[in-house]
Amino acid sequence: TLESLLIAKELLDRHEINRFAVVCLPHLCEQWQNEIKDKFGLDAEIIRSSTISRLEKKLRPDQNVFRDIPYQVISIDYVKQGNKRNIFLDHCPDFVIVDEAHTCAKPTGANKYQQQRYRLLSDLANKPEQQLVLLTATPHSAQSEDFQSLIGLLNPKFETYQHQNS
């Protein structure tokens, strides 16, 4: 957590970015918001179904939360589907931290469109100027296809890489 925020802060200080988003599981939103405030003094807004009405009331009609709120903590389950997903992909910050990225792996045997979280990350990773940090403290499981689906976001060749046992 801290290391990814240090990267964001460094990019902010260098004026290489002027906003960022953390995409995380719903129950981790407050923890991320507190870390951002306590460690860096930045006021991040939590974006999820229970906060969206309040946030939108603060904005002008021509604004949207993903483009016009500089520091965002977003519930992945709020933003993974439908119109919200498309608006996020169109207007999200250039720097996005994805916490618990292992929960976004493509399920073994499934095609990539069967998993909404994976599809969101895949589309995000394919944006040309997107900077993406994937965080996970969960050890690599025996399901190599799941792991390959995540590293395939970094380079599509990795998703089809066949490991040779020696």
Task: Outline where the language-model segments fall.
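A short helix-turn-beta junction within AAA+ P-loop NTPase domains corresponding to the substrate/partner-engaging
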Residues: 147-160
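Conserved helicase ATPase motor motifs in RecA-like P-loop NTPase domains
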Residues: 102, 124, 128-143
